[in-house]
Amino acid sequence: MTDPTPAAVDLDLLAEPRLVVEPGLGARVAAVAGPVLQGMGYRLVRIKVSGELGCTVQIMAERPDGTMLVEDCEAISHALSPVLDIADPVERAYRLEISSPGIDRPLVRRSDFERYEGYLVKIEMAVAVGGRKRFRGLLGPLQGDAVLLAREGARDGEDPNSLLPLEDIASANLVLTDELIAESMRRGKIAEREMKRELGVLPPPPPHAKKSDPTKSNAPKAKLPKAKLKAAKKPPPTNTKEHRLAAAERKRLGQTDPTEGD
């Protein structure tokens, strides 16, 4: 079987930089793996180096449309292993793992936040926003260099909407929900069907067929709750019939209204 190659690659998406990157050893591995992945038509999502049961280097990758198949992981492993052996960024024995981002994936690029608008996320900030660093809620739209989030569990009278600067995000992950699972399955089926057509296993679609786009989410746009503001109390009426009768009686008796002349 021919190694799969992502078709009709969006070059802008492919070259889009990550907002969340690794420090130290992870950064050294990313410097080697990133260009190889991009040359193959894939994007680097995350590098994770762990020392449990020996050293494991996990490289999370995806197609520019956010999908990833088992065949993609195999192709990346075959291409990347010899390059890492020569560059030797780890400098000790390790086990290489190539994986997809998973359903509850990390969000590391602007396009990730755009693609998953309307889904439940958890975000940890490197810099506190409004006195807190951890947020969980519905992902809203991007506003310039920040993303809007409708927090869960906001108190009565508290604005649940938080504007989080993208450059200050330490980590952001989707939260597993039924809607997210359904969306992930939909995208996976589209990617698998396209790969089979590339390999000639399936015939091409008829010219009039509507092509599904895995980069477009089926999630409804997030309806961010509005801040709950306490309504100001209306002042009591001052020109009722009772007020006019009382004023006339005071005038007859030669009394003055203490509020007059204010």
UniProtKB/Swiss-Prot annotation:
Basic residues bias: start-end ranges: 223-233
Biological processes per GO annotation: ribosomal small subunit assembly; translation
Subcellular localization: Cytoplasm
Keyword Cytoplasm tagged: yes
Keywords noted in UniProt: Cytoplasm, Ribosome biogenesis
UniProt similarity note: Belongs to the RimP family.
Role according to the record: Required for maturation of 30S ribosomal subunits.
Protein name: Ribosome maturation factor RimP
Organism, scientific name: Rhodopseudomonas palustris (strain BisB18)
Gene: rimP
